[in-house]
Regions:
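Aromatic-capped, Gly/Pro-kinked transmembrane alpha-helices
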Residues: 279-301, 319-423
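Hydrophobic alpha-helical membrane-embedded or membrane-associated segments
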Residues: 60, 145, 224-227, 264, ...
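Hydrophobic alpha-helical membrane-embedded segments
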Residues: 145, 224-232, 309-328
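Hard-cation-handling environments
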Residues: 240, 250-314
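Positively charged, low-complexity/disordered segments
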Residues: 1-5
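Hydrophobic alpha-helical membrane-insertion segments
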Residues: 185-189, 260-277, 359-363, 411-413
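Hydrophobic transmembrane alpha-helices and their helix-loop junctions in integral membrane proteins
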Residues: 6-256, 267, 273
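Hydrophobic membrane-targeting alpha-helices
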Residues: 66, 155, 233, 316-320, ...
Length: 423
C-alpha cells in the first residue's frame, strides 16, 4: 500500500513538473519573460493607448494570471515553482537593464513593463502567498503603467510624435498636467511609501527575502535600477533644459487626453492602499493563502533597506542627468550600455537559436519533399508511363504479330508444364 502510494506521488510530481514547465513556457511568451521577451520592444510601434491597455494592464500580464491560476499544479512541483521564480528574477533585472539604456520614451516604459512583470512572475514562484502578491502587483501596475504610457502619448502629441528623450527637456513648464500625472506614476513604480507600488512591489521584495537571500537581493537591486532609469526618464523628458527642435512647439494636450491621466494618477497613488486590506482575503480562494495586511506607514527592516536603495537610485539618476545633456544620444563603447540599447541581443539570439535552425530545418524538409515524396509520386507516374509506352507497341494491328505472340505464349506455357513435371 505504501509502495503504491509512493509511486502515485512520484507520478503526480513528474507530471506536475512537466505541466508546470510547459505552462511557464507559455507564460514567458505571453508575458515577455526571458528568453521570449524580444517581441515586446517591437510592439511599441503601436499607439500608446494600445500600450496602456494591452501591454501594461491586460494582455501581456495574462501569463502571470495563467501561472497563478495554475497554483494547484505548482503546489506539487518545487522544481517548476523554482523555475518560475528564477525566470522572474532574471527578467526583472534584464528589463531594468534595457530601460536604463534606451532613448525612446516608449521603449523605456516597455523595458519597465518587462521588469515589473518579472516581479510578478518572481512572486508567483514564491508559493501561495507570493501568488496573491503577484495579482496585487498586476492590478496596481495596470494603473500606474497605463498612466505613464498615456503620459508618453501626451508628450508625443505635444512634440510632434517625437519619442527621443534627448529631444525633450523642461516639458514640465509647458505640459504641467502631463508632468504631474506622470509624476504620480513615477512615484508609484519606484515604490515611494503610501503609493500603490509601495504596497504591492515592496510586499514582493519582502516575500522574496523570506524565500531566500538570493531572490531578495536580486529584487532589491531591481528596485534600485528602476528608481534610476525612471528618474533618468523624468530628468530627460520633463526637467532640465529644453532641447526641442526648432520646428517643434510643445503644448499641453486637450482635456480628452488629460482627464484619463488624472483618473489613472489618482489610482496610481491610492489604489494600493485601498486594496491592501482586502486583496489577500479576496484572492485566498484562488491562491490558497492569505496575504498579511500591512499598515499605511508600517515599514520593517526590509522596507527601510528598500527605501534606501530606491533613494540611491533616484540620486544616481538625478546626478547623471541634470547637466550637459546632449541633443542626441551619445555614442558609447560600454558593453553593458551597448547591450541594453540592442535589447540584450534578444533578436540576435533568436536568429541564431531559432530562425537560422528553423530555415535549415525547413530547407531540409522541403528537399526531402521534393526528392523523396515528390520523387515517389512522380516516379510511379513515370514508370507507369514507360510501361504503357512498351505495352502499347504490342497492339500494332498486324495479325502476324498477334499470331507470333500466341505461339510464344503456347511455347512458354508448354515449357512451364514440362519443367514442372520434371521437377
Amino acid at each position: 500500500s505504501r509502495g503504491l502510494g509512493d509511486v502515485y506521488k512520484r507520478q503526480t510530481s513528474t507530471w506536475a513538473t512537466l505541466l508546470g514547465f510547459m505552462l511557464l513556457l507559455a507564460a514567458c511568451g505571453k508575458s515577455a519573460q526571458v528568453p521570449l521577451q524580444a517581441w515586446l520592444l517591437d510592439a511599441m510601434e503601436g499607439p500608446t493607448p494600445v500600450s496602456a491597455l494591452i501591454h501594461a494592464a491586460t494582455m501581456v500580464t495574462a501569463g502571470v494570471y495563467l501561472v497563478v491560476r495554475s497554483h494547484e499544479i505548482y503546489a506539487h512541483t518545487g522544481a517548476a515553482s523554482l523555475a518560475v521564480a528564477i525566470i522572474g528574477a532574471v527578467t526583472l533585472l534584464f528589463g531594468a537593464w534595457i530601460g536604463s539604456a534606451k532613448k525612446d520614451i516608449k521603449k523605456v516604459l516597455a523595458g519597465s513593463t518587462m521588469s515589473q512583470i518579472g516581479y510578478m512572475m518572481l512572486a508567483a514562484g514564491l508559493g501561495p502567498a507570493g501568488a496573491a502578491l503577484a495579482i496585487f502587483h498586476l492590478l496596481t501596475h495596470g494603473f500606474f503603467k497605463a498612466n505613464m504610457f498615456l503620459g508618453a502619448g501626451s508628450v508625443m502629441h505635444g512634440t510632434g510624435d517625437d519619442t527621443d528623450m534627448y529631444h525633450f527637456g523642461a516639458l514640465s513648464k509647458v505640459m504641467p498636467m502631463t508632468f504631474w500625472t506622470f509624476a504620480c506614476g513615477y512615484l508609484a513604480i519606484i515604490g515611494i511609501p503610501g503609493t500603490s507600488g509601495y504596497f504591492s512591489k515592496d510586499h514582493i521584495i519582502e516575500a522574496a527575502f523570506d524565500k531566500g537571500a538570493v531572490f531578495g537581493v536580486l529584487a532589491l537591486i531591481g528596485a534600485g535600477i528602476t528608481a534610476y532609469y525612471m528618474t533618468r526618464l523624468m530628468m530627460l523628458t520633463f526637467l532640465g533644459t529644453k532641447r526641442w527642435r526648432a520646428d517643434v512647439h510643445p503644448h499641453e494636450s486637450p482635456a480628452v487626453m488629460t482627464i484619463p491621466l488624472i483618473v489613472l494618477a489618482v489610482l496610481s497613488i491610492f489604489a494600493g492602499a485601498f486594496m491592501n486590506n482586502w486583496i489577500g482575503d479576496w484572492l485566498a480562494p484562488a491562491t490558497g493563502a492569505e496575504v498579511e495586511h500591512v499598515g499605511m506607514w508600517h515599514m520593517g527592516v526590509i522596507g527601510v533597506v528598500t527605501l534606501v536603495v530606491v533613494i540611491l537610485g533616484i540620486v544616481a539618476g538625478w546626478l547623471l542627468n541634470r547637466h550637459n545633456v546632449p541633443n542626441e544620444e551619445p555614442e558609447t563603447h560600454d558593453p553593458l550600455l551597448v547591450a541594453g540599447r540592442h535589447d540584450i541581443y534578444g533578436d540576435d539570439i533568436n536568429d541564431v537559436v531559432v530562425v537560422k535552425p528553423g530555415r535549415w530545418l525547413a530547407g531540409g524538409v522541403a528537399g526531402f519533399d521534393r526528392s523523396v515524396v515528390d520523387g515517389l509520386v512522380n516516379g510511379a507516374g513515370s514508370v507507369t508511363t514507360a510501361c504503357s509506352q512498351i505495352i502499347r507497341k504490342v497492339q500494332n494491328g498486324y495479325v502476324r504479330s498477334y499470331g507470333l505472340m500466341m505461339v510464344v505464349g503456347v511455347v512458354v506455357v508448354g515449357l512451364v508444364v514440362v519443367l514442372g513435371r520434371m521437377a
